[in-house]
Amino acid sequence: MDIALAIKALILGIVEGLTEFLPISSTGHLILAGQLLDFNDEKGKIFEIVIQFGAILAVCWEFRHKIIDVIKGLPNDPRQQRFALNVIVATIPAITLALIFGKAIKAHLFNPIVVASAFIIGGLVILWAEWRERHRGQTHDPRGNALLEAAKAGAPRVETLDDLRLSDAFKVGLAQCFALIPGTSRSGSTIIGGLLFGLSRKVATEFSFFLAIPVIFGATVYELYKERALLSTDDLSIFGIGFVAAFISAFFCVRWLLRFIASHDFRGFAWYRIVFGVIVLVTAYTHLIAWQA
């Protein structure tokens, strides 16, 4: 086994696992890391598909009890049927656009400059969304400028996954479409979209996790079938290293994020995106790093 290649696979697997479910864009990080590590050829693209599969399996394991309950309840449990329908409805917009524009997006937008720009814009959107969340529960006293807390106005409308309506799911699905632009972040689009549409932070995050399952599973199966001619048993060890690294790092990342959102917002991720995006743009325009267009 090529040790240098194995180390690259390990690093990229960890990058995928740590960034797939945070609002910072795994695709954007993989594009940048792949170029820095010189691991962005055709085999590298197949490798990215494999490690995404490892990351999504970590979510399936973390939420295995809920997934089993949904499967068991599909024949006769209206609550589980409604949840499954919500996931399906939220998945349709992004899949539809990906099938129509996927090739054009990969041909023209999968480059560091677009990624960096999306990092910055996405960070600004997160800051605005968090500002909106903090001020949603405040209103002005008509007799003066004093602010009064309006608990009812500030409380999220959707506090549990069972409260999620079909229209809510569809709106989150529309928000997910922005994630087709590399650097935007699928989890960031769905979580922030959920917050803007009245979901609590916990519900928006959990629904984003569940929404990732059909999206990433579907993309993995489709891409592996399409690129099956490039698959080789010689690559199994390298793919295996990346797969396991992505699974383990994603598993711990998902658990950490679920604890984190209980007492924190996403402003830290927003500033990270902005700073990282600026660094990429500066290094590109000053030629400190020869990013490929």
Swiss-Prot record:
Gene Ontology process terms (BP): cell wall organization; peptidoglycan biosynthetic process; regulation of cell shape; response to antibiotic
Keyword vocabulary terms for this entry: Antibiotic resistance, Cell inner membrane, Cell membrane, Cell shape, Cell wall biogenesis/degradation, Hydrolase, Membrane, Peptidoglycan synthesis, Transmembrane, Transmembrane helix
Keyword Transmembrane attributed: yes
Name of the molecule in the record: Undecaprenyl-diphosphatase
Annotated transmembrane regions: 3-23, 43-63, 85-105, 109-129, 203-223, 238-258, 269-289
EC number from the UniProt entry: 3.6.1.27
A single Gene Ontology CC term: plasma membrane
Cellular localization per UniProt: Cell inner membrane
Biological role: Catalyzes the dephosphorylation of undecaprenyl diphosphate (UPP). Confers resistance to bacitracin.
Lineage: Bacteria, Pseudomonadati, Pseudomonadota, Betaproteobacteria, Burkholderiales
Membrane topology, record value: Multi-pass membrane protein
Keyword Transferase (UniProt): no
Top-tier EC class: hydrolase
GO-annotated molecular function: undecaprenyl-diphosphatase activity
Family to which the UniProt record says this protein belongs: Belongs to the UppP family.
Recorded catalytic activity of this chain's protein: di-trans,octa-cis-undecaprenyl diphosphate + H2O = di-trans,octa-cis-undecaprenyl phosphate + phosphate + H(+)
Miscellaneous section: Bacitracin is thought to be involved in the inhibition of peptidoglycan synthesis by sequestering undecaprenyl diphosphate, thereby reducing the pool of lipid carrier available.
InterPro entries noted in UniProt: UppP (IPR003824)
